[in-house]
């Protein structure tokens, strides 16, 4: 578990002129721990200036927290299969971020990972907002309902998967989460929605190359 002292450790400037400066301070962020939330890793994100596709997940898993690299577990493998990208192309194509940046730990019930509180999501939104300002991506792919809701305000996956939206000049294409525990894809109509969404992503990626 990430431990912190009595002094605030997180610094946030009022403005950033470079992605590198933003990333340095994001990597050192302990805002959620300072607010009293239990965290099991340090912030996880990956990417560089010039990447025009932005991938927004929900929260790192345990493996991502250990390696401090996004999409390292089985969900990441499934996502790359969906996108038909190998690891090298995947990481060179997408700036990888998430709604909350640290592995939140297991749920108290023992069934899966803890869902980050709304306040945690609000604290982490600062980093996403500045990433999008500095990167100005042409494409944003959200993965999971929490990620889609954070940008689009949607209530459910049914109303957004298979469609393209706009956010500050970028095309936003939501995907469901590729976790094996999700039941959303069990329905044939939702599988068709996923097929449509992936076709939209590929079209956008092709247009940006």
Model-inferred region functions:
Residues 3-206:
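A polyanion-binding, active-site-adjacent surface
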Residues 209:
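Glycine-rich phosphate/pyrophosphate-binding loop and the adjoining helix
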């Amino acid at each position: 578990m990430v431990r912190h002292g009595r002094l605030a450790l997180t610094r946030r400037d009022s403005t950033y002129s470079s992605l590198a400066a933003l990333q340095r301070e994001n990597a050192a962020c302990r805002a959620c721990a300072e607010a009293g939330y239990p965290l099991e890793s340090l912030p996880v994100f990956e990417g560089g200036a010039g990447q025009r596709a932005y991938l927004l997940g929900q929260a790192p898993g345990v493996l991502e927290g250990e390696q401090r690299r996004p999409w390292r577990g089985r969900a990441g493998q499934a996502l790359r299969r969906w996108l038909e990208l190998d690891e090298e192309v995947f990481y060179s194509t997408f700036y990888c971020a998430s709604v909350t940046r640290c592995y939140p730990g297991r749920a108290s019930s023992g069934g899966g990972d803890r869902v980050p509180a709304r306040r945690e999501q609000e604290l982490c939104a600062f980093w996403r907002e500045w990433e999008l300002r500095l990167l100005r991506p042409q494409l944003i792919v959200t993965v999971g309902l929490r990620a889609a809701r954070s940008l689009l305000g949607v209530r459910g996956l049914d109303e957004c998967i298979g469609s393209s939206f706009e956010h500050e000049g970028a095309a936003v294409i939501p995907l469901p989460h590729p976790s094996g525990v999700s039941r959303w894809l069990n329905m044939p109509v939702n599988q068709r929605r996923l097929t449509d969404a992936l076709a939209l992503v590929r079209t956008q990626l092709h247009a940006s190359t």
